[in-house]
């Protein structure tokens, strides 16, 4: 589907309203009620990959430089919630931000690099 398709926009709105966690560390779990490695009843763990996919959507639909602020937010979120080693895990504790599950997870690193690349490409478009 095209990123501007109404169905995609509705999906993103649902992610923002129903999936995005508001426990203090923010982030996006895989799906509503995800219990894999659950740390706190009733709150799913945020995953790097799903959170970065949300950032990638915003990079794709950005129409002006200010629209990239949310992408910057999620890139900074990733850095803030990574250990000093820079190794990214699969998911995070929803309250403490502690790394959980598979560590390191190449997929998490790949999506971070991909998001940075998308950000830079879009930023370059605006700089022309």
Feature names for model-found ranges:
Residues 53, 70-73:
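Extracytoplasmic/secreted proteins, especially bacterial periplasmic and envelope-associated proteins
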Residues 42-60:
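Internal helical hairpin/lid segments
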Residues 1-48, 73-128:
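Extended glycan-interaction surfaces of carbohydrate-active proteins
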Residues 62-63, 120:
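Short coil/turn linking the two alpha-helices of tandem helical-hairpin repeats
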């Amino acid at each position: 589907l095209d990123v501007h398709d109404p169905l995609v926009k509705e999906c993103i709105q649902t992610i923002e309203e129903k999936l995005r966690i508001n426990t203090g560390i923010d982030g996006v779990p895989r799906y509503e009620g995800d219990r894999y490695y659950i740390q706190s009843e009733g709150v799913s763990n945020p995953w790097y990959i799903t959170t970065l996919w949300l950032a990638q959507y915003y990079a794709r639909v950005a129409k002006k430089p200010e629209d990239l602020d949310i992408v910057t937010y999620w890139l900074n979120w990733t850095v803030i919630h990574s250990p000093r080693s820079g190794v990214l895990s699969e998911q995070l504790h929803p309250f403490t931000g502690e790394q959980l599950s598979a560590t390191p997870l190449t997929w998490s690193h790949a999506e971070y690099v991909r998001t940075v690349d998308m950000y830079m490409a879009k930023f370059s478009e605006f700089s022309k």
